[in-house]
Amino acid sequence: MPDTIVDIRGLRKRFGDNEVLKGIDLGVTRGEVIAIIGKSGSGKSTLLRCINGLETFQDGALTVDGEALKHHDAKAMRALRQHVGMIFQSFNLFPHLTVGRNVMLAPALVKQRAAKDGEAQARKLLERVGLAEKFNAMPDQLSGGQQQRVAIARALAMEPAVLLCDEITSALDPELVGEVLRVVESLADDGMTLLMVTHEMGFARKVSDRVVFMHAGRIHEMGSPAALFGNPQTPELKQFLSALHG
């Protein structure tokens, strides 16, 4: 039996009268890389924000690593966020802290990690994302691509079981996209469970085990990259892909 790490059943989410997720069913196996694609407003980012507890949902069930998501239980939510890392399109680094301190902060606060251990881990993670020499730099001294790589290192510092990436290259200049995608690809190669909302279709095709196409708040198609990109089954996916190439 596959080792399911994220299990989503019948998930529904409303903002007022607007239902943005209309019954999502999705199981994610440990080590799996899933790309979530679709037009703006299809519910992609909202789904990620539900998985790590940033958004509450009205109906359905969601478990991560065997633990049910319980919005009313603050302790359970803190534990969930230690299992689920999230990287946003805006890097959200603390501007007054050095790069190293940005990476060290959450483990120190949440896990009470000793400063010496935290520094060693931060240096190791910055080396992993190709920024070993930037430990003492300030965020405003970095390019957007470098800041996003620091944000990846910061998320990894909490040793998450699942990493959520929400359009993490969409705010970058085109020439900086590749350096961030190479880091994400290396995480996939190392067996990290990844769910990524992306507009980088070539990257999704190359790195993903499965691609999820969302349309109007539902999972409209799901399958291997070869199947979805090479043989789309619905008019909506065909139109979405043709618009990208048009």
Specify the residue positions occupied by each region the protein language model found:
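C-terminal boundary and immediately downstream tail of ABC-type ATPase nucleotide-binding domains
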Residues: 215-216, 222, 226-246
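ABC family nucleotide-binding domain
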Residues: 3-225
